[in-house]
Curated annotation (Swiss-Prot):
Pfam family, any one: Omp85
Domain POTRA: 246-328
Source organism of this protein record: Oryza sativa subsp. japonica
Main localization of the protein described in the UniProt heading: plastid
PROSITE patterns attached to this UniProt entry: POTRA
Gene3D superfamilies the UniProt entry points to: membrane protein fhac, membrane protein fhac: a member of the omp85/tpsb transporter family
Designated name of the protein: Outer envelope protein 80, chloroplastic
Compartments, record wording: Plastid, Chloroplast outer membrane
Misc remark: Probably not processed upon targeting to chloroplasts.
Record's keyword terms, sorted: Chloroplast, Membrane, Plastid, Plastid outer membrane
One Gene Ontology term from the biological process aspect of the record: chloroplast organization
Family, similarity comment: Belongs to the OEP80 (TC 1.B.33.2) family.
GO CC terms in record: chloroplast outer membrane; membrane
Length: 665
C-alpha cells in the first residue's frame, strides 16, 4: 500500500491508501449496516442501558475512587426523589453532582476536541441535576450518534461530594484508507471527492452515512439499480464498502397474442429485436436505458406494445429481462387522399386519391416494402420502395433504400397555367435510385445516394414536346427527354421533434456525365428552421435557399411562391430561377382545444437569376422575380398532421386561400 493520499480503483474496488504503512486489514468488531449505520451500535447501547437500568436504582456505583476522601467500598446512595413530572412517567431520579467524559480506561482522552464533542452531545446530564435512567439512556444515544465514538458506557461513582456520572467513551479509529468493492459503474472521483479531506481524522459515522446515501443517490439519479449493501471498519482505520449492482444475466423475448395476451409464436426474428437494444448481457441494469430501449423497439413500427420485466436470478445480484412483445399486423392495403398542385385556382389546390400496399416486416427482419399509386386530375405517381432500416452486419445503424418511381406532375410551377391555344404541360419522370443513410453524430444524420432520372415534358394529349407556347425550350439537351445520373449528399440536424426546436438541412446534388448526352450540373440547397417559446405564443422563423450551376432542365429550376413558399401567390407565381431565397416568420397561439391561430409573413426572391434559366420561362410569363405575402390562418391537429387553412395577401394586394396538410417545408 503506497503513501499517496488519494482514491484509486484497484481491480473491482477503490482504495484510499494509508498515509503510513499499516498492517493488512482484518475485520474489526465494528460492523455498519448500509441502510442504518447505527443499527449495531444502537443494539450495543441498548445492552449498556439495560445494565445501567439494573445497577443505578439499587447501587449506582460501578467503580469506587481511591485516595484521600474517597471510599474504597461501595456506599449507599442518598435518598432518591420521585419524578413528579409527566415526562418521567413516575421513574425514580438520582441527584448527580458531577458529569465527566473519560476514555474507556477512565483516563482523560488524548484529544480534548473529542471530549468536548461528547460533552456537547449531552442534553439532560448536567451537574446538580436529578436524572432518570431514561434520560441517561437518551444521552448515551446522543453521544454515539454524534458519529465519533464506537461505544459509550455510563459509570456512576460515589464520591465525597455526591454521585459522579462518568461517560466512558471509545473513539473510532483514525481514517487511513478506503476499499470499495463491486462499484463497477461508480466513478472513482466520486469517492475521492467524498474522502479527500478525511485522512488522519477520526472516522465519523455520520459522514460515512452521508457518503452511503450519496452513493445510493448517484445510482438512483441515473436509473441504475445499485446500492451500498455492507460497510465495516477494518483494523488500521480502513473503511470497507460493498456495493451491489444489478447485472443483466439474460434477455428473453416472449411474443404475446394481441387479442388474448397469451404467449404465441412471433413473426419477427429475435436477433432483429436484440440488435436494437443498448442493454446487453453482463451490463449493469439501468432502468432509464431499458426505457429507452422500449421506445426504440416501438419506433421500429412493427410492435403494438412492448414491456420489459426484470426478474431476479436466485440469490445473486443478477436479473433476467423478459421482453413481452405484441406484434402489429405485418402488412395490408390502404387508401387515402391528399393535396395536389395540379389545379392552382380557387381556395383548394386540388385533391388526389391514393392506394397503397405496405409490408412493414419483410422476412421478419423489419425490412419495409411499399407499393403506392396516387392519382389526381393531372398528377399521377407510381412508387415502389424497399427499405432496410439497419443493414445486416453493420454496426453504424446504416439504412438502405431502393426506389423506383414513375410520375407525372404539372409543369405549372415553372411554365405557367393553361393557355387558350395551348393545353397544360406535364413533366414525366422515370426515376430509380439507391440511398444509404445513417446517424453519424448525436442529432446529426447523413444520406448518400445515386439516382438516375429520365424526364421530359408532355402536352395535354401525352405527346412529348420540347418547346412551350412561348417557344421556350423544355429540355436542356434539345431532345424529348433529358437523362441525368445524380450523386446526392444530404446532412440533417435536428435537436428534437418539437416545432420550437432547431432544424437544419444541407443538400448537394451533382450530375455525373457518364455518357456525353447526360446532364452535368451541381445543385446546392439549404433549409433552416428555429422556434422560440414566448409565453403562450410560439415564434417560428425559417429560411431556405439554393443555387444550380451547369446544364440543367428548365423544369428543375427553383419555383418561388405558393402554400409552402410565399403565401398570397399562386404556386410558382413569384418566379423561377437558378438561385432563390425565401424567408418566413410565424407567430402562433393556442386558441382552444386542437385549434391554433397564426399570423405570418413571407418573402421570396430569385436573386435576379430568372433570365439564366434555359428559355427564361419566368421572364416570358412576366413573373416579378420577388415578392412578399402576409396573412392569418388556423390550424387543427389531426392524425395526418396539422391541417392548415390560411388567408393571405401579397404585395400586389391580391388575396388567396391556402390549404395544406403537415408542417411547411
Amino acid at each position: 500500500m503506497g503513501t499517496r493520499r488519494d482514491v484509486r480503483f484497484v481491480s473491482s474496488g477503490v482504495k484510499l491508501p494509508c498515509a503510513d504503512a499499516a498492517p493488512a486489514p482484518a475485520p474489526a468488531p465494528t460492523l455498519l449496516s448500509a441502510a442504518l449505520p447505527f443499527a449495531r451500535i444502537g443494539r450495543a447501547i441498548d445492552g449498556v442501558v439495560r445494565h445501567v437500568a439494573r445497577s443505578l436504582p439499587r447501587l449506582p456505583v460501578a467503580r469506587a475512587e481511591t485516595g484521600a476522601g474517597a471510599a474504597a467500598a461501595p456506599i449507599a446512595l442518598p435518598r432518591r426523589q420521585k419524578d413528579g413530572g409527566g415526562g418521567g412517567g413516575g421513574e425514580e431520579r438520582v441527584l448527580i453532582s458531577e458529569v465527566a467524559v473519560r476514555g474507556k480506561d477512565g483516563e482523560p482522552l488524548e484529544r480534548p476536541e473529542l471530549e468536548a464533542a461528547a460533552a456537547a452531545a449531552l442534553r439532560a446530564c448536567r451537574p446538580n441535576a436529578a436524572l432518570t435512567v431514561r434520560e441517561v439512556q437518551e444521552d448515551v444515544h446522543r453521544v454515539v450518534e454524534s458519529g465519533l465514538f464506537r461505544s459509550c458506557m455510563p459509570v456512576a461513582v460515589d464520591t465525597r461530594d455526591g454521585i459522579r456520572l462518568v461517560f466512558e467513551v471509545e473513539p473510532n479509529q483514525d481514517f487511513h484508507g478506503l476499499v470499495c468493492e463491486g462499484a463497477n459503474m461508480l466513478p472513482s472521483k466520486f469517492l475521492e471527492d467524498a474522502f479527500h479531506d478525511r485522512h488522519g481524522k477520526i472516522i465519523n459515522i455520520r459522514h460515512l452515512d452521508q457518503v452511503i446515501k450519496s452513493v445510493n443517490g448517484w445510482y438512483q439519479e441515473r436509473g441504475l439499480t445499485g446500492l451500498v449493501s455492507y460497510a465495516e471498519i477494518l483494523s488500521g482505520g480502513i473503511l470497507r464498502l460493498q456495493v451491489s449492482e444489478a447485472e443483466v444475466n439474460n434477455i428473453n423475448i416472449r411474443f404475446l397474442d394481441r387479442r388474448t395476451g397469451e404467449p404465441t409464436v412471433g413473426k419477427t426474428q429475435p436477433e432483429t429485436i436484440l440488435r436494437h437494444l443498448t442493454t446487453k448481457k453482463g451490463q449493469a441494469y439501468n432502468r432509464a436505458q431499458v426505457k429507452r430501449d422500449v421506445e426504440t423497439i416501438l419506433t421500429m413500427g412493427i410492435m403494438e406494445d412492448v414491456t420489459i420485466i426484470p426478474q431476479p436470478v436466485g440469490d445473486s445480484n443478477k436479473v433476467d429481462l423478459v421482453m413481452n412483445l405484441v406484434e402489429r399486423p405485418s402488412g395490408g392495403f390502404s387508401a387515402g387522399g391528399g393535396i395536389s398542385s395540379g389545379i392552382t385556382n380557387g381556395p383548394l389546390s386540388g385533391l388526389i386519391g391514393s392506394f397503397a400496399y405496405s409490408h412493414r416486416n419483410v422476412f421478419g427482419r423489419n425490412k419495409k416494402l411499399n407499393l403506392s399509386l396516387e392519382r389526381g386530375q393531372i398528377d399521377s405517381i407510381f412508387r415502389l420502395n424497399y427499405t432496410d432500416p439497419w443493414i445486416d452486419g453493420d454496426n453504424k445503424r446504416t439504412s438502405r433504400t431502393i426506389m423506383v418511381q414513375n410520375s407525372r406532375t404539372p409543369g405549372t410551377l415553372i411554365h405557367g397555367g393553361d393557355h387558350p391555344d395551348h393545353g397544360p404541360i406535364t413533366i414525366g419522370r422515370v426515376t430509380a435510385g439507391i440511398e444509404y443513410s445513417r446517424p453519424f453524430r448525436p442529432k446529426w444524420s447523413g444520406t448518400l445516394g445515386l439516382i438516375f432520372q429520365h424526364a421530359g415534358a408532355r402536352d395535354d394529349k401525352g405527346n412529348p414536346i420540347i418547346r412551350d407556347f412561348y417557344n421556350s425550350q423544355l429540355t436542356a439537351s434539345g431532345n424529348a427527354y433529358d437523362d441525368t445520373l445524380l450523386a446526392k449528399l444530404e446532412s440533417v440536424y435536428t435537436d428534437s421533434g418539437d416545432r420550437s426546436s432547431t432544424m437544419f438541412v444541407f443538400n448537394i446534388e451533382q450530375g455525373l456525365p457518364i455518357l456525353p448526352e447526360w446532364l452535368s450540373f451541381n445543385r446546392v440547397t439549404a433549409r433552416l428552421r428555429q422556434g422560440y417559446e414566448i409565453g403562450p405564443a410560439r415564434l417560428l422563423l425559417s429560411a431556405s435557399g439554393g443555387h444550380v450551376e451547369g446544364n440543367f432542365s428548365p423544369h428543375e429550376a427553383f419555383a418561388i411562391g405558393g402554400t409552402n413558399s410565399v403565401r398570397g401567390y399562386e404556386e410558382g407565381a413569384v418566379g423561377s430561377g437558378r438561385s432563390y431565397a425565401v424567408g418566413s416568420g410565424e407567430v402562433s397561439c393556442r386558441m382552444f382545444g386542437p385549434l391554433e391561430g397564426v399570423v405570418f409573413g413571407d418573402y421570396g426572391s430569385d436573386l435576379s437569376s430568372g433570365p439564366k434559366v434555359p428559355g427564361d420561362p419566368a421572364g416570358a410569363r412576366g413573373k416579378p422575380g420577388s415578392g412578399y405575402g402576409y396573412g392569418v390562418g388556423v390550424r387543427v391537429d389531426s392524425p395526418l398532421g396539422p391541417l392548415r387553412l390560411e388567408y393571405a395577401f401579397n404585395d400586389k394586394q391580391a388575396r388567396r386561400f391556402h390549404f395544406g396538410v403537415g408542417y411547411r417545408n
